[in-house]
Amino acid sequence: MNSTRITSCIAALLLALLAGCVVPPGSPTGLMDVAERPAEKALLAGMRAYDDGQYPQAEQSLNQALTAGLASPKDRAAAHKYLAFIFCTSGRVPACEAQFRAARGDDPAFALSKAEAGHPQWGPVYQRVQR
């Protein structure tokens, strides 16, 4: 009976020690926190400029975002994707190809949506880079 009590005490001690090792969750990062980082702020500005048809401004902001060091591989891939779109639509096909390759390099899961991949200007370039 004594060995059962010792085993129970050891088990309780181990559980107590393990409970002390649990790392409390950090506070979640919100959009407003991320939007204040220079690289992420430049990415958002570039995406807005692109959506507004301000392609030279979008190109500048997206390059600035990449230079400033976007933390997320998905964010870097998004910046490269928008740059690829800009380059393809302005006839800079080699630069477009390079941006699609860079997007895939930063995020191996990178893929255009079906609608994006079907675009007449950058769709064929994207398909060629995927081979």
Task: Describe each model-derived feature in a short phrase.
Residues M1-V23:
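Sec-dependent bacterial lipoprotein signal peptides
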Residues L15-A39:
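Bacterial Sec signal peptide processing site at the extreme N-terminus
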Residues S72-R76, G105-Q121:
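Boundary/linker segments of alpha-helical solenoid repeat arrays
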